[in-house]
Amino acid sequence: LNVKKLLFVFLFFSFKIFSQDPVFTQFYNVPEYINPSFTGASGGTNISVLNRTQWFGLNYGLNSQFFSIDGFSEKMNSGLGLSIMNHQESTTRYNFTQMNFNYSYQVKLNRDWGFYPSISAGFGVKDYAFDNLLLEDQILIYQGIINVNSNDPFLTNDSVSFFDMSAGFLVFNDRLWFGANLKHLTNPNISFDNEGGKVKLKSFLSVHGGYKIPLKTRYKREKFNLYFNMNYMRQANFDRLDIGSLVKYNGISLGVFGAFAPTSLDSKSHKLTSLNFVTNMDYKRFTFGYSYDYNLSSLIDTKGIFEISVSYQFDSIFGDNSSIPCGCK
């Protein structure tokens, strides 16, 4: 089998994995992933980690991790942060890693409202792991053995690195927030073909918002809030809308989200693709999150998707905490 034909067939059937960014159900716990404008929005310093395990009922597993650290500087009137995302597929050994430096600038519209424009820049690496394939020059028929190495020079370019940028904005007060972000402004070339092939990484649009409603209790010390959150994402012909609510009482929250495919290209596919059950627990400066996505589509037998997240918030590493607080948490 011709190696180039083999590789292009391999990529064709894996297109959705290679050309799409991972998404996270707990976007509200790692907001820097959907929009760098959240950088510094908490007023202090925030560290977050999240792990997503997808389709663990199959041998075809997808796993994603996200890490971020950010803080607010009053002297610079800005938020500064670093984020790292990793995504891997267990069968093909495809791996996608991206590191970004995030910057946001605070504009105080008045005493209650803030406007955060932002920009993010970094580098990404997509590794297609073609060394996992068995090619024709490795099969030594007359000797009856398999050579562990291939001499085909086409396989030497199975990793692609690229520069990437995104820009966004966020408008918020202590109860309401709304923002948008556009990733991959440079539409980097992610083709492994060193003979002039071009495969553009499509722009990733995210539009998101939320609203917090304080609920009354008998005791003033009790904190009882209702949150409504939504996040719309679109990349090329694929889109998704997450919308739902959480009830938070004294540091413990429970909620449910629906994941929709608003403009599905398949008339037989489900518009509501999954029900996502979420919970959070605050303990001192920590926030622990867990979510489980129950699939309603043809992937119902894959045992769903679950995420675990941990966040830690403390005073700003820049020595000040004067930003307008965001009502996103």
PLM region spans:
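Sec-dependent N-terminal signal peptides
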Residues: 5-15
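Short alpha-helical segments used as structural interaction elements across diverse proteins
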Residues: 1-2, 13, 49
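Subset of outer-membrane beta-barrel
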Residues: 20-329
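Positively charged n-region of N-terminal signal peptides that target proteins for export
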Residues: 1-6, 109-111
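Absolute protein N-terminus
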Residues: 3, 19-20
